[in-house]
Amino acid sequence: MNNRLTSALLAASLLFALTLASCGTPAAENSTPPTAPPAQGSQVLEADKPTPAETAGTSEDVPSETPAASGSNILVVWFSRVGITPFADGVDAESSASINIRDGELVGNMQYLAEFVAEETGGDLFQIITEQEYPVAYRDTTDLAKVEQNSNARPALASHVENMDQYDGVFLGFPNWWGTLPQAVMTFLEEYDFSGKTIVPFCSHGGSRLGRGPQDIAALCPGAELLDGLAVSGSAVSGAQSDVQAWLDNLKLD
């Protein structure tokens, strides 16, 4: 009797083991491997008119924090609707106001200038990105900018500098919208203490150069030293490197 019971138990155990083995391959083999998160870029890129290079897309395509500290004491900041506006793939740069193409990508004027300034100064790059996207149509953007200015709005920002204390000098690039800084740039300036820092403005414009920009910067950052800025016509940005170089040389930064 005992022998029969033992044999029955062994047979049942063997059948159970075979059933488990036939239930399929391990989950790891059947599941799709998780997609690696996109690498965070060290920069992102504008203007009064967006110019030669920037990927069409939304603000989700843009890093939201300062690049990893490089040891530089110079930060090159810029604001552009390119990078926070959902331009469609294949947008016609020639027929669209303020849009330019470089190496197959959209780029804002301010990104174009900021990258050159960073290259020449060894500064870190940072783009001011708003939580709200801006309209694709340039006229709609300028209309929105006017509404923001009339209400003295402070658009919420999605990008923030985590290590501002590292920087002694800040180059600040912006498009001249309605005679001065975009309201989002004012949000940026009010977010940090610039006391003891040097601010150097540069802008793209459609005829009014820096406008009230320097005065507004001085009012928002009373403890900062403000150096002479550079104004580049939006239609001349792609050929302005010699002008930018001469301006940088004259600044005689430490």
Model regions: which residues?
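N-terminal beta1-alpha1-beta2 submodule of the flavodoxin-like/Rossmannoid cofactor-binding fold
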Residues: 24-25, 37, 44-167, 249-254
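C-terminal motif of bacterial Sec signal peptides marking the signal peptidase cleavage site
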Residues: 18-22
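Short, surface-exposed alpha-helical segments at coil->helix boundaries
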Residues: 107, 111, 115, 182, ...
